[in-house]
Amino acid sequence: MLDFKGETLNYDLPVSLPKADMQSKEAIDIYQLIIHAFTEAGYEYEYNEEEKCFVFTREDDELTYTFSVDVGLVSGDGNIVNWLGVWTTIEDEDFETENEDKIYTTTDDGKLLTYEEIFSNAGSIIQIVENDITEEFYDEKRENL
């Protein structure tokens, strides 16, 4: 459970997350923040056991947005990793495009970002995909017609 901006975040986390992550308060809090950023933007989420990632999906009138966010926040030395990989797919019934990005969790020298910064990083990726990458999607689709 995490108090963040006046809200209590308590999203369900799968018990199959890496053991080191489940034993780290910071890792659990970061997962809560990432899930919160996506659910606030209208995404539903599930955990993909086979791929070991969170999958966030939202459909609008024409497009389906799917974000896959890696897990494994705690490194072998017990510190929080610098970032989590994010793979995005935007598709409609005729066409699909993919994008790769990162949600940063620490500074380059390993200092944990503030929870506001981590939440903002996740939200920024959503905005970039929904605006810039969607525009690229339509441009690429037009070129392929």
Regions found by a protein language model. Give the residues of each.
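Ampiphathic alpha-helical segments that act as solvent-exposed interaction surfaces
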Residues: E26, I30-I34, E96-L145
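General "foldedness" signal
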Residues: N48, T57, S68-D70, D132
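Negatively charged, low-complexity tracts enriched in Asp/Glu with abundant Ser/Thr
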Residues: L2-E62, D139-L145
